[in-house]
């Protein structure tokens, strides 16, 4: 309709109408492509896809955390209470850009971040609780698909992200000054993190595919009825893409959760470490009263990281 209206503009109607019709066809092709891609997922359509993209716009704003100390605001990495989304006995789900600081007794301790939005007490991610959540998620998605209300369920899920109904289990404070980048900062560590951005994709997919047989046994032994019902329903209706998504989702939460790409990156780092130049120190020649001598103490902050101290 908009393209037809553009065509009635005097003098420039013909070229504008053609351009508007071409643009409308491009938008329709893009919409059909997104509908085809998201149609294999439960409760997804183009409108839900756009709402999900719009909901991601609030993430950068939540990545700045401040601490009020005697009326003075300090930028900190410690999560405030408003950033805590969900808590279990050993896991805290929080907004990105911070690390939970939990007070236990008379001492505060930084929890170990295992993901940008997940922190655990000791760095180990318990799989039992996460698999129960996946069981509930898959069961709800199966029910929505069976009742043909997938768009409604997706809308309710997006709106539900604005509200949190979870009792507090831990006392979170902002007096730890936690580090988002835990551990000793080295060149190999930074190289490992950079490799994590591109290397683990194929390894992660292959690892999840290889864990599917064990995941099927865990579904039956652990009585995960929501996942079993989802696999059975999607298999009966012939939607094998959803069956594969459910299997990969359940297999991704292994009993001993670890970063598969991290292991591959560590192996690569072990091989490349043989070619490491090791510690070094820049030597500078200083001219004092016409005589040259070596100044071995002329180090800046960046050079001191390479001396091995």
From Swiss-Prot:
Q: Which residues lie on this side of the membrane: Lumenal?
A: 62-230, 252-309
- Tree of life domain: Viruses
Q: Which residues form the propeptide?
A: 50-63
The region annotated as signal peptide is: none
Q: Where is the region HVR1?
A: 256-282
Q: GO cellular component annotations, sorted alphabetically?
A: host cell endoplasmic reticulum membrane; host cell lipid droplet; host cell mitochondrial membrane; host cell nucleus; membrane; ribonucleoprotein complex; viral envelope; viral nucleocapsid
Q: Which residues are glycosylated?
A: 68, 81, 106, 177, 289, 295, 302
Annotated site residues (Cleavage) in this chain:
49-50, 63-64, 255-256
| Transmembrane intervals | 41-61, 231-251
GO molecular function terms listed in the Swiss-Prot or TrEMBL record: RNA binding; structural molecule activity
**Which stretches does the entry tag as region Important for fusion?**
137-168
Region (Important for lipid droplets localization) residue spans: 36-39
Q: Which family does it belong to?
A: Belongs to the hepacivirus polyprotein family.
Q: What else is known?
A: Viral particle assembly takes place at the surface of ER-derived membranes in close proximity to lipid droplets. NS2 associates with E1/E2 glycoproteins, NS3 and NS5A, which interacts with the viral RNA and core protein to promote genome encapsidation. The nucleocapsid buds at the ER membrane where E1/E2 glycoproteins are anchored and afterward associate with nascent lipid droplet to acquire APOE and APOC. Secretion of viral particles is probably regulated by viroporin p7.
Name the record gives this protein: Genome polyprotein
Q: What is the lineage of its organism?
A: Viruses, Riboviria, Orthornavirae, Kitrinoviricota, Flasuviricetes
